[in-house]
């Protein structure tokens, strides 16, 4: 073998090694914002917000204008992870100690059984018992809070007492005082995504923004100085999240992960009007009410899917859709087994790829407390 042949052969082997190192299935990052109003992204109609990274996600993906979550956090998250309407998922109100029934199959379990590494970074809020926690529901790794909210720096829950600390790594309580929760989320995402590039990952980033307590960066408080409160505080927190989204996308590109990673973005429910968020701040436009309500402003949420390699870019879909649809949609896009899959959701792939297709839903079901 001469030198030229050796170089060509070696180069071919190296190239083959690089190709083989790429996961056969796409990575997935499912981003769930918290109490994010129906229209509180520029591309969804807000006129006073700066959200360049969420807007870029829509420019490079498909944006849904008639998309639904649930009136409150736990109900929304249970339906998201099971692909089932609230009553069937087993949660019709916010979770306390008891939460998502362990016998329900979650999207994380489906991903894991098909060879994915799985992580939940951020907020669980589907029960505080360890035997029904994230590690028991399909997540290889969990870093975040088990309850509904914490102070973003101390990671204590301050409301009505007792003041409980809530920060966990898997089933071990940890402490990270003084470190901003969402910033720590991003560090954990970066570590998990790069631990093993030979296997695909599924990361559920349940970020707790713009949920109270409203603790935005000074940069954005200054930017929105002319907005009246509570809109100013809320808007600054939304833009704080937008910065972290931009940092995530920059990281994915730098690591060579962007092309093969599906990004899904959605809010859990409408904006809060609770006293802890100064009775408002969010924007639902023509849609009545907000969080805790069955009216449109409580359940209609912004939603985007972005995978430029395979899906349309800069397109809008007005078809009826719901968070339960992400389960079958991601299973189809990732080429996973659908055997014994028990979901109420419908794959959005036909609608995503062809805007002329009709919604597969005739009726959506919502349950929350005594509202249904």
What are these regions (language model features)?
Residues 2-14, 20-372:
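Formylglycine-dependent sulfatase
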């Amino acid at each position: 073998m001469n030198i030229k042949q050796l170089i060509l052969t070696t180069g071919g082997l190296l190239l083959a090694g690089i190709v083989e190192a790429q996961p056969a299935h796409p990575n997935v990052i499912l981003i769930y914002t918290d109490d994010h109003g129906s229209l509180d992204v520029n591309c969804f109609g807000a006129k006073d917000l700066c959200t360049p990274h969420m807007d870029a996600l829509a420019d490079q993906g498909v944006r849904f204008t008639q998309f639904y979550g649930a009136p409150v956090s736990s109900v929304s998250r249970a339906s998201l992870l099971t692909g089932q309407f609230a009553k069937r998922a087993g949660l019709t109100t916010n979770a306390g100690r008891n939460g998502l029934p362990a016998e329900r199959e979650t999207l994380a379990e489906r991903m894991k059984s098909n060879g994915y590494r799985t992580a939940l970074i951020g907020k669980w809020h589907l029960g505080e018992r360890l035997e029904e926690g994230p590690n028991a529901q399909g997540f290889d790794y969990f870093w975040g809070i088990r309850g509904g909210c914490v102070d973003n720096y101390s990671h204590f829950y301050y409301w009505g007492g007792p003041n409980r600390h809530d920060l966990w790594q898997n089933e071990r309580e940890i402490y990270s005082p003084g470190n901003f929760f969402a910033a720590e989320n991003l560090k954990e995402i970066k570590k998990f995504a790069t631990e093993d590039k030979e296997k695909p990952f599924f990361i559920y980033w349940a970020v707790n923004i713009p949920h109270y307590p409203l603790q935005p960066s000074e940069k954005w408080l200054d930017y929105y100085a002319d907005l009246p409160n509570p809109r100013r505080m809320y808007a600054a927190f939304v833009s704080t999240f937008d910065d972290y989204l931009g940092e995530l996308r920059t990281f994915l590109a730098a690591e060579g992960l962007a092309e093969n990673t599906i990004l899904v973005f959605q809010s859990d429910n409408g904006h809060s009007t609770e006293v802890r968020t100064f009775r408002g701040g969010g924007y639902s436009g023509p849609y009545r009410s907000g969080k805790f309500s069955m009216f449109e402003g409580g359940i209609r949420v912004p939603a985007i899917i972005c995978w430029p390699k395979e899906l349309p870019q800069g397109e809008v879909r007005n078809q009826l859709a719901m968070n339960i649809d992400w389960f079958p949609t991601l299973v189809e896009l990732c080429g996973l087994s659908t055997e014994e899959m028990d979901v109420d959701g419908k794959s959005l792939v036909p609608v995503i790829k062809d805007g002329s297709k009709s919604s597969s839903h005739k009726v959506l079901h919502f349950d929350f407390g005594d509202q249904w």
